[in-house]
From Swiss-Prot:
Record carries keyword Cell inner membrane: yes
Description of how the protein assembles with itself and partners: The system is composed of three essential subunits: KdpA, KdpB and KdpC.
Function summary: Part of the high-affinity ATP-driven potassium transport (or Kdp) system, which catalyzes the hydrolysis of ATP coupled with the electrogenic transport of potassium into the cytoplasm. This subunit is responsible for energy coupling to the transport system and for the release of the potassium ions to the cytoplasm.
InterPro entries found in the cross-reference section: ATPase_P-typ_cyto_dom_N (IPR023299), ATPase_P-typ_P_site (IPR018303), ATPase_P-typ_TM_dom_sf (IPR023298), ATPase_P-typ_transduc_dom_A_sf (IPR008250), HAD-like_sf (IPR036412), HAD_sf (IPR023214), P-type_ATPase_bsu_IA (IPR006391), P_typ_ATPase (IPR001757)
List of residues binding ATP: D344, E348, F377, T378, A379, Q380, S381, R382, M383, S384, K395
GO cellular component: plasma membrane
Family: Belongs to the cation transport ATPase (P-type) (TC 3.A.3) family. Type IA subfamily.
Signal peptide (UniProt feature, chain positions): none
The protein, known as: Potassium-transporting ATPase ATP-binding subunit
UniProt catalytic activity: K(+)(out) + ATP + H2O = K(+)(in) + ADP + phosphate + H(+)
Catalytic-site annotation from UniProt: D307
Length: 682
């Protein structure tokens, strides 16, 4: 992607995030995060107590209470800053997209045809169903479908890809996106959306929306954090009468400090930032997610449906071998195959011409001088070829050639059937060549499996993800390629109905399914899949059915999408583990400091040997605030992701974030206590 990648702490974003952090101090903003709302209330309460102590209305150490109050406000500000910084990065990405939107005029046609009378209207007044004409140099004013014409289109403003693409009426390349530019020729387009509903508008809203909906896992975690907060709130509330009964009541300031240090403020302050950053990281790979729910679902996926062509294989099948029929010389087959392919501009056709040239020095003949009639490939005939000097040469699929021969009163040779099976078992696609009603032999078209793909599938398998290859090839060819690529299963001779049925079958087993698609025929399956990545080069129907759009139109990106989803879930889980483990050290810091005067036996818990009760409590509160700042980079970038089994991943995270969550606070609180003591601040 050519877009500028934002630095983690871009100065302009940091300044803006600090301003937003202050704005978020209002109660309406704080209420959305129950854990931090408790801290906000505690900050307000201790501020009032500090003022009362300073004015003499209440007894107590006003300076200590003010210090606690100040650091509680800092804790809230740091949590606000983390969320604002994540949102700011997304808004910066949205602003780069807004730059694509250009106020322009459109030529609205009165009739749906080229050459019809046109009215010049503002582009933002176009409605769904309006017909517009765009010519070379024009900006396409709306999302739509090409109903007439063909043109080269520069989509770099949307995709970041500088190479132009062809958009034309009919087929899967008729969809155009508003904001892109026509480089040559012309298009007549039917607008498919109303103002404010374009793909670009939706992209901006998705990456900019501060009022994003929480995902199911995020809601579940929030409920857990609220439950823990309530438990600690009740526990802290009972400590005041407990200490008062002992003859030395603990101050409200100390109790508030204890509560704030015990509740999971670390994950509470970073939870929103993690969710926003997940969508932002997805956008960084040029994938637009319609919601955080889609990103989260990607992390839970356990079945991947992968198209063979372009995802598992390179996609350009190359002629690798000429296999003559019984009684036919290989050179005769190669000559006929080359003649039939002279006008075939597909990669397969060109590779046949080149292979014949390499094997038998059969030079490519001048098409014009042959005075031949070329027969183009059609979906109905599934054959192509040439008529030359009373010779009728055809090449095509086995079934198509068989029907062609039988229609001309011939018989398909049994030995060629065997050769076809042999080619298919090797993972190649058989193409049969016939002259008249005589079968000359088979061309093997080899689809090359991408390097390293087998290892990636092995990693996915280790993570518990099943890979299924989807292909239109016959079962023998599909089985051979599946074995070579290392996928777990395959669906051969796939149809849209078969894809949809397969997705429903896996979902009935309780699995979450991810897939990619680009055509209108993929729309039902995309709508059914839990994670559906539509290609930006695909049809409008496919993009509307999916819950993600890949701007690069790269089917392989599906594996990366799953990795990002899993990384977001791992980040959330790891920081939750770290946050809860933190409480142990804070317990050893504050409990002895708060209650040792009443119960001297609790001094045994002061294993850190902190200087004084005041320094112990203040050190814990300061650490509680600072740890949020130190973890912001981790929340935004995500934890280091490695493809491991669920049990191995759990063990790794417990060691790193569980044990780390235990040890880091002990070290941090002790260091802060020493600094406070050396500086004479307590």
């Amino acid at each position: 992607m050519s877009r500028k990648q934002l630095a983690l702490f871009e100065p302009t974003l940091v300044v803006q995030a600090l301003k937003e952090a202050v704005k978020k101090l209002n109660p309406q903003a704080q209420w959305r995060n129950p854990v931090m709302f408790i801290v906000w209330i505690g900050s307000l309460l201790t501020t009032c107590i500090s003022i009362a102590m300073a004015s003499g209305a209440m007894p107590g150490n006003a300076l200590f209470s003010a210090a606690i109050s100040g650091w509680l406000w800092v804790t809230v500000l740091f949590a606000n800053f983390a969320e604002a910084l994540a949102e700011g990065r997304s808004k910066a990405q949205a602003n780069s997209l807004k730059g694509v939107k250009k106020t322009a005029f459109a030529r609205k046609l009165r009739e749906p045809k080229y050459g019809a009378a046109a009215d010049k209207v503002p582009a933002d007044q176009l409605r769904k169903g309006d017909i517009v004409l765009v010519e070379a140099g024009d900006i396409i004013p709306c999302d739509g479908e090409v109903i007439e014409g063909g043109a080269s289109v520069d989509e770099s403003a949307i995709t970041g890809e500088s190479a132009p693409v062809i958009r034309e009426s009919g087929g899967d390349f008729a969809s155009v996106t508003g904001g892109t530019r026509i480089l040559s020729d012309w298009l007549v387009i039917e607008c498919s959306v109303n103002p404010g509903e374009t793909f670009l508008d939706r992209m901006i809203a998705m990456v900019e929306g501060a009022q994003r909906r929480k995902t199911p896992n995020e809601i579940a975690l929030t409920i857990l954090l609220i439950a823990l907060t309530i438990v600690f709130l009740l526990a802290t509330a009972t400590l005041w009468p407990f200490s008062a009964w002992g003859g030395n009541a603990v101050s409200v300031t100390v109790l508030v400090a204890l509560l704030v240090c015990l509740i999971p403020t670390t994950i509470g302050g970073l939870l929103s930032a993690i969710g926003v950053a997940g969508m932002s990281r997805m956008l960084g790979t040029n994938v637009i997610a319609t919601s955080g729910r889609a990103v989260e679902a990607a992390g839970d996926v356990d079945v991947l449906l992968l198209d063979k062509t372009g995802t598992i294989t390179l996609g350009n099948r190359q002629a690798s071998e000429f296999i003559p029929a019984q009684g036919v010389e290989e050179k005769t087959l190669a000559d006929a195959a080359q003649l039939a392919s002279l006008a075939d501009e597909t990669p397969e056709g060109r590779s046949i011409v080149i292979l014949a040239k390499q094997r038998f020095n059969l030079r490519e003949r001048d098409v014009q001088s042959l005075h031949a009639t070329f027969v183009p490939f059609t979906a109905q005939s599934r054959m192509s070829g040439i008529n030359i000097d009373n010779r009728m040469i055809r090449k095509g699929s086995v079934d198509a050639i068989r029907r062609h021969i039988e229609a001309n009163g011939g018989h398909f040779p049994a030995d060629v059937d065997q050769k076809v099976d042999q080619v298919a078992r090797q993972g190649a696609t058989p193409l049969v060549v016939v002259e008249g009603s005589r079968v000359l032999g088979v061309i093997a078209l080899k689809d090359i499996v991408k390097g390293g793909i087998k290892e990636r599938f092995a990693q996915l398998r280790q993570m518990g993800i099943k890979t299924v290859m989807i292909t239109g090839d016959n079962r023998l060819t599909a089985a051979a390629i599946a074995a070579e690529a290392g996928v777990d299963d395959f669906l051969a001779e796939a149809t849209p109905e078969a894809k949809l049925a397969l997705i429903r079958q896996y979902q009935a087993e309780g699995r979450l399914v991810a897939m990619t698609g680009d055509g209108t025929n993929d729309a039902p399956a995309l709508a059914q899949a839990d994670v559906a990545v539509a290609m930006n080069s695909g049809t409008q129907a496919a993009k509307e059915a999916g819950n993600m759009v890949d701007l690069d139109s790269n089917p392989t990106k599906l594996i990366e999408v799953v990795h990002i989803g899993k990384q977001m879930l791992m980040t959330r889980g790891s920081l939750t583990t770290f946050s809860i483990a933190n409480d142990v050290a804070k317990y050893f810091a504050i409990i002895p400091a708060a209650f040792a005067a009443t119960y001297p036996q609790l001094n045994a818990l002061n294993i850190m040997r902190l200087h004084s009760p005041d320094s112990a409590i203040l050190s814990a509160v300061i650490f509680n605030a600072l740890i949020i700042v130190f973890l912001i980079p981790l929340a935004l970038k995500g934890v280091s992701y490695k493809p491991l089994t669920a049990s191995a991943m759990l063990r790794r995270n417990l060691w790193i974030y569980g044990l780390g969550g235990l040890l880091v606070p002990f070290i941090g609180i002790k260091v802060i206590d020493l600094l406070l003591t050396v500086c004479g601040l307590v």
